């Protein structure tokens, strides 16, 4: 028996004969955080809107728990749109109470649930304040609270961190991970590499309405090879050519070159090899003034697959 909550089978969506989603087939598994990663206009939002029944595909099939999605019970889905949708003239508590009553949540249960959600999203002290007085980050958190007040089994988040500062983003991520702890399935669209990498169990990289790759973040990054990027800046850039020639003997080196007067190395287990790199540089009468290491990112994968950066 399949563990897929949502299944797309050769789904196409066209507007004026232009395919914005083109022959998309994938499965979202129960209890996972599933990320759609791609630039704006890639077809991410259209795909999730079809998944939850807000749009009908031009062709293809969409199944929810093995059944045609037209039979979907709206109480099973919580949707957090990219745009903030709140009643500005009501308090935070009143917003959640109103939406909870629409889902027929018993009064006592609803009040208790509102307090828990506000605490989880660090909004307890804003409970009785008008939504219109909240900051942008707080409104984003309220948006997710509204989408999850009825305890849906599937939570859909469209660009949840758009425009947020790092602190608000971290609070939002913690709440998304909490949804997984509750056993819920989370589907999110994002163009932020760190968000997709940090949160997602699996990531679908999508561009021009087509699925390019689908796998775990770790396996996706292995597409461009197992390795780290080391950047060296010497006190005298005229030594770069000499040092590059010396560093070519480092084991597991995949690439080495000069860029912006810095030396760039791509190699396996870079952290373990740092002492050897530093020793080799210093033993050749050069001095390192700056050194950094970073791992391959999902944006590197996107560049490998499309030949361009994610935000282009």
Language-model features: where?
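Conserved ABC ATPase signature
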Residues: 130-134
């Amino acid at each position: 028996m399949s563990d897929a909550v949502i299944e797309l089978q050769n789904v196409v969506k066209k507007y004026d004969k232009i395919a914005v989603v083109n022959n998309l087939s994938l499965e979202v598994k129960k209890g996972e955080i599933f990320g759609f990663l791609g630039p704006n206009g890639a077809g991410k939002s259209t795909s999730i809107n079809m998944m939850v029944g807000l749009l009908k595909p031009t062709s293809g099939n969409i199944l929810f728990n093995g059944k045609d999605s037209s039979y979907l019970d709206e109480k099973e889905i919580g949707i957090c749109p990219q745009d903030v949708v709140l009643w500005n003239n009501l308090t935070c508590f009143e917003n959640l109470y109103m939406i909870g009553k629409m889902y027929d949540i018993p009064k006592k249960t609803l009040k208790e649930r509102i307090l828990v959600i506000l605490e989880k999203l660090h909004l307890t002290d804003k409970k009785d304040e008008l939504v219109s007085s909240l900051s942008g980050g707080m409104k984003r958190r309220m948006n997710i609270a509204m989408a999850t007040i009825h305890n849906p089994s599937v939570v859909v988040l469209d660009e949840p961190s758009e425009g947020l500062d790092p602190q608000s983003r971290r609070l939002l991520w913690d709440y998304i991970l909490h949804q997984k702890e509750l056993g819920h399935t989370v589907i999110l669209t994002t163009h932020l590499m760190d968000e997709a990498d940090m949160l997602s169990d699996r990531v679908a990289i999508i561009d021009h309405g087509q699925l390019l790759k689908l796998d775990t973040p770790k396996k996706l990054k292995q597409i461009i090879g197992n390795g780290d990027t080391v950047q060296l800046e010497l006190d005298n850039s005229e030594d770069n050519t000499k040092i590059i020639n010396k560093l070519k003997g480092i084991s597991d080196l995949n690439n080495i070159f000069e860029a912006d007067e810095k030396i760039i190395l791509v190699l396996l287990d870079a952290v373990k090899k740092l002492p050897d790199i530093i020793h080799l540089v210093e033993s050749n009468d050069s001095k390192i003034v700056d050194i950094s290491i970073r791992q391959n990112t999902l944006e590197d994968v996107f560049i490998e697959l499309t030949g361009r950066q994610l935000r282009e």
